[in-house]
Design a protein with these regions (language model features):
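Conserved small/polar residues in nucleotide/adenosyl-binding loops
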Residues: 149-156
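Short, basic/glycine-rich phosphate-binding loops at helix/coil junctions
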Residues: 74-77, 124-136
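Soluble or luminal CAZymes and related metallo-dependent hydrolases
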Residues: 20, 92, 144-148
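Surface-exposed cleft-lining segments at the edges of enzyme active sites
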Residues: 85, 99-100, 130-144
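A contiguous catalytic/ligand-binding core that recognizes phosphate-bearing ligands
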Residues: 84, 88-124
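Short, catalytically relevant binding-site loops at active-site mouths
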Residues: 69-70, 116-117, 131-133
Length: 160
């Protein structure tokens, strides 16, 4: 996570730089470094903040909050509910697609379950817990990142 502080985040830098210097965030960072060293954690470190990388703050039209990343290999990609193509859409995403169809009469315009196109169109797909241990739902729900993502989601919705 050392690279997290120095990289660019598509316009989110002012919010990130302020939080990255706080003690609670330093604790989260240290915890995640240990977790990644000792366990299988999803998503891969380099895409933990993928939701912010793909959706600039000025482009956010809607925020969709998920609980935590998918717990199985090859699924978590740093976007709530999204899975990389050609992974089949999980049941939670199929429910979202079904709701879209019922409400709009149209099918979702994504290939498989990869919601990257939505993120690039202004849908902030943010999990309240950004990481998870393989096979263990809610395993990182108490490390403080939930407060961080709630803060980001709240600040974002104030500007919609």
């Amino acid at each position: 996570m050392n690279a997290a502080v120095s990289r660019s985040y598509n316009g989110w830098e002012p919010l990130f730089s302020e939080e990255f210097s706080k003690d609670y965030f330093k604790g989260i960072k240290a915890f995640l470094e240990r977790e990644y060293a000792q366990k299988t954690v999803y998503p891969p470190k380099k895409i933990i903040l993928n939701a912010f990388d793909l959706t600039a703050p000025q482009d956010v039209k809607v925020v969709i909050l998920g609980q935590d990343p998918y717990i199985n290999p090859g699924q978590a990609m740093g976007l709530a509910f999204s899975v990389p193509y050609p992974v089949p859409p999980p049941p939670s995403l199929l429910n979202i697609f079904r709701e879209i169809k019922e409400e709009t009469g149209r099918d979702s315009a994504v290939k498989g379950g990869d919601l990257t196109v939505w993120a690039k169109q202004g849908v902030l797909l943010l999990n309240t817990s950004l990481t998870v241990v393989r096979g263990v739902s809610n395993s990182h729900s108490n490390i403080g990142a939930v407060s961080y993502t709630h803060l980001r989601a709240h600040e974002t919705t104030l500007h919609l």
